[in-house]
C-alpha cells in the first residue's frame, strides 16, 4: 500500500504545483528553474498526500469484507486514488480561481478555467478506468495500466500547456512624484484619514450601543458609514495598496503580503494558493517571506498624486513605504520602529521622509517613553510581549503622527493603526464568546476587554481629530478588512500544525467599513456597499481633483450632502501615471 500511496501523493502534488504555477504566470517552465519549486513545495506536499492516501487505503482495508492486498502499483487502486486526486485538484483550481479572479489577468483566468475542466474530465476518466479494470479482470491489466499512464500524464500536461511557458511582466514607467514647480493651492479643505487593520463594524456598533467607544458612537450618530468590500488575499499590504491607489492588484502590482522565496533558491513566488495550507510553507521554513518595498507599487499612491497637485501630505505607519517616498510633506514607514533599533537606522533612517523630520520623530518617541501607562493594564490581561508589542507600536506611531501634524500642518493626514489585526487574531474569542459557543470562566472573561482596549486607542484618536476639524474639513475612518471568528475546522488545523491560540481570521475577506464625519458629510448609515478601491477616488473628489479613468474605484458622492455635491461635479483624467 505504501508504494501506491506515494504514487498517488506524487500525482496530487503535481496538481498543487500546477495551481502554484498558474497563480504565478511569470514563473518560467524551465526544468532548472522549476527544480527548487519541486524540491521544496513539492516535497512538503508529496509527504502529506502520501500519508493521506495511505490512511484512505487503511480505512478501505478495515471496511472491506475480504482481505484487501493491492499490488505494488495496482491499476485499480491508483485509478480510484487518481480520481480522488483529480477531483480535489479541480476543486482546488476552481476555488482559487473564484477567490483570486480579481487579481489575475484574463489569460490566467481562462487557463485556470480550462485546467479545472481538464482535471474534472480526468477524474471521470479515472473512475471509468477503475470500472473497466474491475469488469474485465486480469485480461485488461496491461491496457488499463497504459490508459492509467495516459490519463495521469494528460491531466498534468494539458493544464501546464494551457498555462503557457511563462510571461515576462512589463516594466512600468511613470513621472516623478513631486512637481516642484507646481504652486500649492490655498488652505482649503483638510482631510484626516484614520486607517484600521481588522476593524469590525459589528463590534463597534455593539460597543457604542452599550455606551462604550463614545467617539465612534458620535461618528455613527452624526456622520455617514458604509461597509467596504475588500479583496483576496486579505493581507494588509494588498488591501491598502488597492485603497491607496484606487486600483486592483492587477494594476497596482501588490498581490499578497510579500514576495515568497524558495528556501533552496530559484524564482520567487508572488501568490500562494489557498485551501491547501500553503501558508504553512512559510511557517515551516520551506518559503522565506520578503516584505514589499515602495518600489513594488506599479502605480501612484494617493500621497504621490496629491503631492504633484500641490497638497501637503502626512502619512504615518503605512506599508509599501520603505524606503519612504518623496512627497510634499512627510512619510514615516511602518518599518521605522524596526529599523530604528539598528545603529544605522537610528541616525539616518530610510523609513522617514524628509530626513529633517527625524528630529521630530525622535522627540515624539522620547515624550512617549516618559509615559508608563500600557495599552492594556496588567490587571486586565497578562499579555505576552508578542501581542502587547502591537499596542506599543500603535501608541508610538500615534504619537509620531500627532507630533508631525502639529509641527508641519499638512492638508491631508493619513495615519494607520495595526494592533486590532494582531490582537483580533488572538482575543476575538474572548470579546465575542457567543460567536464561538463558549461559556468563559473567570480567567478568560477578564480577557474579554483586551480587544476593546485597543479600539479605545483609536477612539481617542477619533475624538482628537473631531475636535480639530474646521467647517470645511472631513475625517474618514477606514477599515480595509474586517475580522471574524475562525471556524471549527480551521481552529483544529491551527491546533495541530499552527498556532493553537489563534481564533480570529480574515481569510474569507470579511467586509471593512468607511466612516465619514464633518460638516459636508451626509448623516446616516448607507445601505450601499462600497469597495476598498473607492477610498482614493473619494478623497480626490472631495479635494476637487479629477478621478483617473484607469482607476477601478468610484467616488462615493453619497457620503456628502447634496449642497456639497451639487456644486462639485465629478471630473476625470485619463491617468495620473504619466
Give short role names for the model-derived ranges.
Residues 178-180, 471-518, 552, 568-572:
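Histidine-centered active-site microenvironments of extracellular/periplasmic hydrolases
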Residues 34-39, 202-258, 312-314:
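Short, structured active-site-proximal loop/turn typified by the sulfatase FGly-forming signature C/S-X-P-X-R
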Residues 2-173, 247-441:
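His/Asp/Glu-rich, glycine-adjacent segments
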Residues 164-227, 234:
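Active-site-proximal N-terminal segment of extracellular/periplasmic enzymes that hydrolyze or transfer
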Residues 463, 496-545, 562:
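Substrate-binding rim/cap in mid-to-C-terminal beta-strand-loop elements of soluble/periplasmic
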